Amino acid sequence: MRNPIDTFERWLIQSDGLGYADVAMYREFYKGEHDIRLSKRQETRLGITSAQIRSLANICPLVVDTVAERLSVQSFAATSPATERALAMWWAARDLSTYQDDIHLSALRDGDSYVIVEWDDAAVMPEFHHEMSYDGSNGTGIIYSSERRVPLYGFKKWRLEEGDDRGRARLNLYFDNRIEKYITGRAGAWTEYHDGERWPIPWVDATGQPLGVPVVHFPTNPNGDDYGTSELEAIIPLQRVLTSLWVDLIAAADATGFQLVTLTGDVPSEEMVNAARAIWYSQNPAAAWGTIPPGDLSLLVEAVRHATMTIAQVSRVPLTMFQDSRAVAAADTIVASERGLIAKIADRAKTYGLSWRRVMRHAVRLHNTFGPRPALDEAGIVTNWDSFEELDYLTLEKSRAAVAASHLSNGLSMTAAYTLAGYSAAELAAIARTDTYGEEGLTQ
């Protein structure tokens, strides 16, 4: 039998240097915990904490969530109708329509996510466990063969936080034909973990053939590599710039954003507080009053806008999602602005679709080994996605009409109001031809 220490050392050597430490950074930036900190003097001077400034300037969730929200598996197709029905039943029974959101989001944020497929004897069906990517301390991963891109084994490592073994670490290694479980001893050495099952747990079918590694990998944009790339990989440097610009803008606004009153020839009293409607005076005939005009903040404001625009370009998320505007774009404009985003979502769906197919193939294999008859055919399983397009024309029209009505109530002409609301010249002409929406009716 394989020495557990040798097994773990092999895992440790092969998994070293795979960039797991970056996963923790991606999660911190997603939560707004950036590595830019205000000094105590800045916090006191600006009246704002490091946590508040990071929350104010945090764009990372939008970059991830915009893609994750549009990735939704609709159903699975298969060569066999019986297989299709089984997949649909498992999907509904295991609430995977909800759990898929967490799987996709963590894959986009961390670069990789995982699903472990096991068999549930009580429910007589497969069960699916979403596992987070390994961050150097806890999590799941896969080790691939250096010769061919095939999984050698998967792993899950975690720290126990309850029970008699609290403070000890657990490690499961998932091979294609067995599962090995380990736990650290009191001295920190790894030993076999026995929970009433055979050790190692056989992972083979009725004929003794391997069932395959039950850990399924969901990589994001692997670019031919074994592992994925976080959506935040290229955004974090820009996020640091944006956060720093916000600090500069707030500091500049506090120091030079308002007109200052000057006094020469006298000493100001404590009652001279720069407040609204305050009246200052001096009884000294030599006193002279003056003002220092507010500083020009437009360059810093433009720098913030440019950094935001660069993030939009790099992430291929439409700029309109980063900025608030009363003007509503026309439908054609929205479609054009989302082409890059839709292309990225479709690319991610291709990769995740293959992963979902592996999940369901493994589930069928477990059903055929441990479940009731008849056996299911795993051939031809295909992942079907909901539409990636999010354009709701009825909602768009309601929004545009509301914006137009707001402009009209402020006294704008019909042409100006509807142009600002995103209506094209052809749409304006059609509106003007109707009795209900004529110029007179709209401005009454």
What are these regions (language model features)?
Residues 103-106, 118, 253-261, 321-326, ...:
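Short coil/turn segments at secondary-structure boundaries
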Residues 108, 114-223:
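Extended, regular secondary-structure scaffolds
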Residues 358-385, 429-432:
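A glycine-biased, small/acidic residue-tolerant capping/turn segment at secondary-structure junctions
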Residues 421-444:
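Long, highly charged low-complexity segments enriched in Glu/Asp and Lys/Arg with interspersed Ser/Thr
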